[in-house]
């Protein structure tokens, strides 16, 4: 996490990137803050120390990149450290970063039933049942792996992870996937129509939420970002963990067989490597 004030700048990162960050920050104004190391201040503590008495006491961040739970915790900590306030609708990088990469446009593919073991419509039905049990009638699915699992779709937007950039809103009578059209092949579009999933532009989710009426919308503060959590349509909110994570954790027979087959292939690859290493040394 990078933090910039009028007079200083700092970067917080964990131990995986200490060496790389130290190298990259040489010759810059940024100080390296090693997370989870004794003596390293939190962002709020550092800001409370760094901001001069005559500085503006407002901290800006892009709420689209900050989970609601983290935003709430940071807001309280900033208040304790210097009486600072938090603004979550600020994306300065978008204003100054010319040529900033956009959302990836790689095509989405369908996960075959021979690997999924359960249809999308069946998963949506189970999710809707869980929502009612939790006192909700709809939910925002924000985790990319939750969306991919629910819809039996896969993508390549994140390196080494079969997910795609999207949002998903699930209601009792409908489901809406927010994704750029160019990512969908004719086959995937037809598949989504068959499964009862409507498609809207990726950037239109906030406008859509403002039109939602008479919903009890489940919002998981650990997965839904601060900006979306603060959008207010004509609906009540239910704060609770997303039911999808627990459902996804219980593997069906087809998924368990896939795990076994993957472990066999992985074991063969490891054995071949160890054999080569033993003979080469």
For each feature predicted by the language model, list its residue ranges.
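A composition/biophysics-driven feature that prefers long, compositionally simple stretches
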Residues: 1-280
């Amino acid at each position: 996490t990078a933090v910039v004030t009028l007079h200083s700048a700092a970067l917080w990162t964990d131990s995986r990137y200490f060496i790389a960050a130290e190298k990259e920050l040489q010759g810059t104004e940024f100080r390296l803050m090693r997370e989870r190391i004794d003596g390293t201040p939190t962002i709020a503590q550092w800001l409370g120390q760094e901001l001069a008495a005559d500085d503006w006491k407002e901290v800006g961040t892009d709420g689209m990149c900050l989970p609601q739970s983290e935003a709430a915790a940071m807001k309280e900590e900033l208040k304790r450290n210097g009486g600072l306030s938090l603004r979550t609708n600020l994306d300065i990088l978008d204003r100054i970063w010319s040529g900033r990469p956009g959302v990836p446009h790689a095509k989405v593919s369908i996960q075959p039933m021979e690997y999924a073991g359960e249809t999308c419509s069946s998963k949506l039905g189970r999710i809707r049942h869980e929502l009612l049990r939790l006192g909700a009638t709809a939910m925002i699915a924000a985790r990319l792996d939750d969306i991919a699992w629910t819809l039996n779709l896969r993508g390549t937007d994140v390196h080494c992870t079969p997910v795609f950039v999207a949002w998903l809103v699930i209601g009792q009578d409908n489901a809406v996937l927010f994704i750029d059209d160019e990512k969908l092949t004719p086959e995937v579009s037809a598949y989504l129509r068959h499964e009862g999933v409507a498609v809207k532009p990726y950037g239109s989710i906030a406008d859509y939420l403002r039109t939602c009426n008479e919903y009890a919308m489940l919002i998981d503060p650990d997965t839904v970002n601060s900006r979306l959590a603060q959008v207010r349509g004509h609906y009540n909110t239910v704060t609770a963990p997303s039911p999808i994570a627990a459902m996804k954790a219980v593997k069906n027979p087809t998924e368990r067989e896939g795990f076994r087959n993957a472990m066999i292939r992985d074991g063969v690859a490891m054995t071949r490597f160890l054999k080569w290493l033993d003979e080469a040394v």
